[in-house]
Amino acid sequence: MSLTDVMTLQAAFSLTVVLCEFPSGYLADRIGYRASMLVGGGSWVAGWLVYAWAASFGTVVLAEMILGAGAAFMSGADRALLWVSLEATGRGGQYTRWEGRMRAAGQTSEAVTSAAGGWLYTIKPRLPFWLQIPAAALGLASIIALREIPRPAATPHRSHLERAWHVLRFALWRQRRLRAAMALAVALGVSSFVMVWLIQPYMRGRGIPPSWFGPVWAAAHAWLALVSLASARIVGAFGVRATLLGCCLLVPLGYAGLSASTSAAGVVFYLAFMTLRGLQGPILARVMQEEAPPDDRASVLSLAALLFRLSFVIAGPPIGALVDRVGMDAALAVLGVVFTIASLAAFLPFTRAHGHA
């Protein structure tokens, strides 16, 4: 597959998430966070089953769509459940720390499996996909074992459509602080997520053997896990605003470093994006949780994820085409300028809305 095909495939995943994201978050607020996560966990098992049997590009697209639906039903509900669980036990102030731990656990798992993935592929190309099935089943079993904190009854509204429209208006128009946090999360999220899909062709272009892709990926995600674990302490030392400004400055550092480097050692600049992801994720998740209405917490988090995914659906294929047309180095230079402007443009309204942070 060309890079355009790869980016198009990921755009299909993101498009499915876009279609399911806000409805799934709204449903989680109505029927319960755990119930939504059960749907997501079941979809993951089904998606990896389809992937393991895929024999055509179309079937792979179908698998990505099923996985995308699963991601949508998990997104928002998992973090909302974490928030209400901590609040119920009097530990709401520790959310950033636990959010970082949750992200670190996921990234550590990805680091370990990435290191083994290439080796498993050499044994049998479909083996990594088959092994995803019991892993997804274990995740589903973990969700089944969860217990949800009972919540007060939601404020009655005339219809679900009216309630959903109320959430959209509140988050995107009425609540300036929430809107600013969402915009910054999208700008920083897309800036770093694009490199997740460009780093392998970048390494190939710098002469790094494919056998090293897994170890490099694993090392990067191990670093991301460490940053996520340290995010609460970093925020405590420097404050929210200074830490997020640092995240914005990591965007040009990462893109410029990768673009200008001509040797394999340039891959070290990829850690700028891992650092960005490890810091901004827990910080902005907490900000959005604090500003979200209690009855619509998962809806707000899902809306933020929807905006991020929609941005990638729009930007992904053109970025892949840009790399195919002008080459990796020139494309990275262009992306560095565009994403730096976007990140700083989103950071300024955030500082005005959250001046005390």
Where are these predicted regions, by residue range?
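Helix-loop junctions on the cytosolic side of multi-pass membrane transporters
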Residues: 125, 132-159, 348-357
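Helix-boundary and loop/linker segments of multi-pass membrane transporters
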Residues: 156-157, 169-175, 206, 258-260, ...
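Substrate-agnostic recognition of the 12-TM MFS/MFS-like secondary transporter fold
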Residues: 9-26, 35, 40-43, 59, ...
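A helix-boundary/kink motif common to multi-pass secondary transporters
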Residues: 2, 32-33, 56, 124-125, ...
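C-terminal ends and interior cores of transmembrane alpha-helices
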Residues: 42-55, 249-262
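Primarily residues marking transmembrane-helix entry/exit sites
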Residues: 3, 57, 61, 164, ...
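Short amphipathic helix-loop junctions that connect adjacent transmembrane helices
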Residues: 1-5, 197-211
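Juxtamembrane intracellular "pre-TM" segments in multi-pass secondary transporters
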Residues: 147-183
